[in-house]
Amino acid sequence: MPEAPTIDGGNTVWLLVSTALVLLMTPGLALFYGGLNRAKGVLNMMMMSFSAIGLISVLWWFYGFSVAFGTDVNGFWGDPGAYLGTKTFMAETDLWGATAENPSGIGVPLYVFMAFQMVFAVITVALISGAISDRAKFAGWLVFAFGWATLVYFPVAHWVWGGGIIGGDIHALDFAGGTAVHINAGAAALAVALVLGKRLGWPREGMKPHNIPLVALGAGLLWFGWFGFNAGSELTVDSVAGLAFINTQLATAAAVLGWLAVEWIKDKKPTMVGASSGAVAGLVAITPACGFIAPWASVLLGIVAGAVCALAVSLKYKLGYDDSLDVVGVHFVGGWIGSLWLGLFATNSVNAAITDVVGASDGLFYGGGVTQLGRQAIAGLIVTVWSFGIAWLLAFAIEKTIGFRLKPEAEVEGIDLAEHAESGYDLSLAGGSGGGSAFALAGIGTPAGAAGTKPASDESEPVSEKVAG
């Protein structure tokens, strides 16, 4: 008689807590992006993140989870009808990973795993918004988010984690989303930024962060929630979850030091924006590697990622693309660093699943040669090309139909007022309706975005200011 399915209380509670932690990351991202942005666009910046929670959650329940984690059809997507939203699953019997030989799987109800992966999809879409602040119509953003999630994120999640071509055939490693989340979102961010073009006045006018305490608060919430993102991706309560947890902390802390070192050397002044951005860069880089490398390699990864990303944010000035809040410089570059790091430092001495389950190889410095490094590079290239190409086509089509780029006069007025009829701050001297010098000082309704701004150039712009615009 086959064994009856049994829920594992420890695994289920851990994944529920991790889901809540990852959900918290999107409001944290809204605060982080909102603080980095100019005051006259802070609410729109936050709206793009909060709208992603609403839209992507429903899409994931209805068909996204099926496309990502349904039975593999051809290596490119899962069976769309496998977990269609019209179906109902029993918590006591429908357990994730269950097989005839192991009817309990990991002992976690299917709906818990669905919710955990749902919040990954949400924040991946929200990340893209940082590249197009102040100039994207809200309706255009919603259409783009719908199309990109459907055509890119859901299939790519299947390629990486659902038994598709990257995880199942190429045997590339990605513990929590370096390829599926960060390279994916970063490539899309670059494409949309190119289609929409530069903000008015960029880079001649300084576009500094309007609220640095908000940036720090958002970074802190991201750091806190990322423990669920990374350690939760083990799905079970075991030693690998502990490894992912400590590696996340070590890499992030080291990345703060790496970013600040670059600021200190280049600009002679370490900044709070730099520390916050360094933390995010470290979190991004450790994401694919947290459960596959030793702690010492995580520290080294953090230092490298913090320093390289601090330098990478300057590329937009040299190459002329307006990635407003440095999604490319932090998420795309950081995702690539972390993914390739696995080809050097992955070892089954800390996680036997590397060879026993995934079918991957140890990294170069653990005797595996360059095999895994090549696999990681191929996986990253596939996702980069697909995400960039589809995002560019979607953004171009939206611009030519309903319009994606905000009108110049609306951009000058401020996207919060133009698109949402509200502003983040009531700074009028009378406490009332709007004009006045206090608004100008806050960058609301002024072309330059702030009083007293200075011209920017790639030679003179401090690293901390490049992060913000």
Language-model regions, residue ranges each:
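Glycine- and aromatic-enriched membrane alpha-helices
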Residues: M1-G469
